[in-house]
């Protein structure tokens, strides 16, 4: 009887040890993911995008010796009301630190499904450039609404603030060392600063508070290969989606 009790106690102790180790690994990986994103998110907000010409980023062997790199920033808002198309509006801008010039495009998309249920991409792009911190079209645009949207567009990096990132707790952590890929998801409230900023700038048709998703691929300690994206997911279900995504990263320049 005593031996059985001792074995039971030993088994329970080992179980608690395994759980503790697993929990510790999860906490450690969460801290690593946060640290990896903090390198970039600590730069937010950058009200004057031209400041990026003088900002350093992570560099590795993928960069030529004399290449300062190109910052690529993107932000998009996607809204799909129940039973309707997924409507997306966003912008991509590449700031070349060598030439101190920036160009990109504003885009709109309405993704619908055809008769066979396959999504049909209908993206329209409007080329833009940045001059004196102002984004302007490089070709004539007849649609006044599109022109106004481009004129008023702001990237999250210009108004977002992640100083409270370290305070986000109990995230849903995922890590695959083989890819490698990683993510951390946190439930936010509508009182969160960035959520308020998004609601201020976009007509978001839900009162649900979003989840913040930090996701990336490549070496957690830093890599110019792969990506790091952040996403605010308000609604995610079949036939109905509302999310905002954003990214900022330094890549080797295509034209030096």
UniProtKB/Swiss-Prot annotation:
In the UniProt record, the signal sequence range is: 1-24
Q: Where is the lipid attached (N-palmitoyl cysteine)?
A: 25
- Keywords of this entry: Cell membrane, Lipoprotein, Membrane, Palmitate, Signal
* Membrane topology, record value: Lipid-anchor
- The highest taxon in the source lineage is Bacteria
Where does it localize? Cell membrane
Can you supply one Gene Ontology CC term for this chain's record? plasma membrane
Name the record gives this protein: Uncharacterized lipoprotein in plc 3'region
Q: Which organism is it from?
A: Staphylococcus aureus
């Amino acid at each position: 009887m005593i031996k059985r009790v001792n074995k039971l106690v030993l088994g329970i102790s080992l179980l608690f040890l395994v759980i503790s180790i697993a929990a510790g690994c999860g906490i450690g990986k969460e801290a690593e993911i946060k640290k990896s994103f903090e390198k970039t998110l600590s730069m937010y907000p950058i009200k004057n995008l031209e400041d990026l010409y003088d900002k350093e980023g992570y560099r590795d062997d993928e960069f030529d010796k004399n290449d300062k790199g190109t910052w690529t920033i993107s932000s998009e808002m996607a809204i799909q009301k129940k039973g309707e198309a997924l409507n997306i509006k966003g912008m991509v801008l590449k700031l070349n630190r060598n030439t101190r010039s920036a160009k990109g495009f504003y885009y709109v998309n309405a993704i619908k499904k055809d008769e066979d249920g396959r999504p049909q991409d209908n993206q329209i792009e409007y080329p833009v450039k940045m001059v004196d911190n102002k984004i302007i079209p490089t070709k004539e645009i007849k649609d006044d609404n599109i022109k106004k949207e481009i004129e008023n567009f702001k990237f999250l990096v210009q108004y977002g603030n992640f100083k409270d990132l370290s305070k986000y707790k109990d995230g849903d952590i995922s890590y695959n060392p083989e890819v490698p890929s990683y993510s951390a998801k946190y439930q936010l409230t509508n009182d969160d600063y960035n959520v308020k900023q998004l609601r201020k700038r976009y007509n978001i048709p839900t009162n649900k508070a979003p989840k913040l998703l930090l996701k990336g691929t490549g070496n957690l300690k830093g890599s110019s290969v792969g990506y790091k994206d952040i996403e605010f997911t308000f609604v995610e279900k079949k036939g109905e989606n509302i999310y905002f995504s954003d990214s900022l990263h330094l890549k080797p320049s295509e034209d030096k």
